[in-house]
Regions:
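Bacterial N-terminal signal peptides that target proteins for export
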Residues: 3-14
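A periodicity- and composition-biased signal for non-globular, repetitive helical segments
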Residues: 8-9, 18, 240, 257
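Bacterial N-terminal signal peptides
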Residues: 12-22
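Catalytic-site microenvironment of enzymes
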Residues: 26-413
Length: 413
């Protein structure tokens, strides 16, 4: 009779080949999951677009506040010396001597001052991509953005953001903008699936130092599918196909709800928006993250992100009456004196090469939001808990549209 291997030994035999295949060969680049090695020569298109003092200010205050950028970037008054990875030839990037000598970056997007609004069309000439957050549909449970109480209408973020996106698209087009959606239905835009990502999942767990198990491997493969592969594909659509002036990322926030079949509802309900930046030293170890950070910095996205996000935050706060969410962790820093604006290193707002307005209003599992979701979308106003309110989806879309009109429509002034 054959002796059966213990389950742990069998798992090691199954996982070891995946790790061996995933192991990088030799020295060189350390990449984040599913990333391709960047072409550092493309940074030369940013020659002379920024001064050394402004470069350092953005690194210190926005993109890498912990100072770990100094391991990879050296600044002199006339040039930036950028190290792609250990042992690589540095990229020498000429810098402008004065602010008045800076050049306009070579990029596909236009900032607000490069276009002129028309009477009644405050967004004329503006190209906008709307990114409805998450996947929804059959993947909603996998991505843990779904819950249901009894036989009530399920609360599903991917479906909710898509409803808002379709309403917002019509409003922005009526204001003169050209508008695209990164997805027009529930589901994935990427052809990747978890069963094709086991090797990448094994490498990701190895880098984290996480213990290997069949369950962890399957969970990580799923995470790489819906959170990494999907976002990378949307970034490809934005940067290579749509090439907009702005991306509007639509999300709903949430507090911990426990068992999605028996979720906990909360009284908390709040609002915030996220800007790109706030990278840590560990994140900066990834060559692709350093590269995409520099593309955002040198492309001049921060000023535009800050201005547009300020306007949208103001409009959302007025429309919803929500208080600002406050982070109490090192992975987020305030973007300005505006309590609604925060800086975080998220994959989406880092990979999109143009400015991004990343919205996180409402708490999906708050009692008020749950009650409004049960009413679905509707025109006009209804009595909700003694208040006359529009549908939560139209309130969201109206406020974002108004904020963008306030910011871009005032460009001529």
């Amino acid at each position: 009779m054959k002796k059966l291997l213990p389950q742990a030994s069998l798992l090691r035999l199954l996982v070891l080949p995946l790790l061996l295949l995933a192991m990088p060969s030799g020295r060189g680049a350390l990449l984040s999951p599913l990333a391709s090695p960047p072409d550092w020569s493309t940074l030369h298109r940013f020659s002379g677009v920024i001064t050394a003092s402004e470069f350092e200010r953005l690194l210190r205050q926005v993109y890498v506040p912990d100072g770990s950028w100094r391991q990879w970037i050296s600044l002199t008054p006339g040039q930036a010396i950028i190290t792609p990875h250990d042992g690589a030839t540095p990229v020498i990037l000429p810098l402008a001597s004065t602010e008045s000598a800076t050049k306009i970056p070579s990029r596909f997007w236009k900032e607000r001052g490069q276009r002129s609004p028309q009477p009644g069309k405050p967004l004329a000439g503006l190209r906008i991509a709307i990114d409805p957050g998450h996947l929804g549909g059959k993947f909603a449970r996998m991505e843990a953005r779904w819950f249901q109480i009894g036989h009530s209408r399920p609360v599903e973020e991917g479906e909710m953001t898509l409803i808002v996106a379709k309403i917002l698209k019509k409003k922005l087009e009526a204001m003169g903008a050209e508008v695209w959606l990164t997805r027009s239905r529930n589901g994935a835009t990427t052809s990747l699936r978890p069963d094709k990502l086991k090797k990448a999942a094994a490498l990701s767990l190895q880098e984290e130092g996480a213990p290997l198990s069949r369950t962890r491997l399957e969970f990580e493969a799923e995470r790489l599918f819906y959170r990494v592969g999907e976002i990378r594909n949307r970034a490809r659509l934005v940067n290579s196909v749509i090439r907009p002036d702005l991306v509007v990322c639509l999300h709903f926030n949430a507090e911990e709800w426990g068992n999605p079949a028996r979720p906990t509802l909360t009284d908390k309900n709040h609002l915030h928006l996220l800007l790109s930046g706030g990278m840590s030293g560990n994140e900066l170890l990834h060559e692709d993250e350093r590269y995409t950070m520099l593309v955002k910095l040198l492309g001049g996205t921060h000023r535009e992100e800050l201005g547009a996000s300020e306007a949208v935050a103001r409009s959302l706060a007025t429309a919803t009456g929500l208080s600002p969410f406050t982070y109490h962790s090192a992975n987020a820093i305030p973007a300005s004196s505006n309590p609604y604006l925060w800086i975080r290193n998220l994959l989406a707002n880092r990979l999109f090469e143009c400015p991004v307005v990343y919205c996180e209003p409402y708490v999906m599992n708050s009692k008020p939001v749950f009650n409004r979701v049960q009413l679905a979308d509707y025109e006009g106003r209804r009595n909700v808990g003694g208040l006359s309110l529009p549908s939560i989806y139209r309130e969201y879309a109206d406020a974002v549209a108004q904020g963008l009109a306030d910011y871009y429509g005032g460009a001529a002034n």
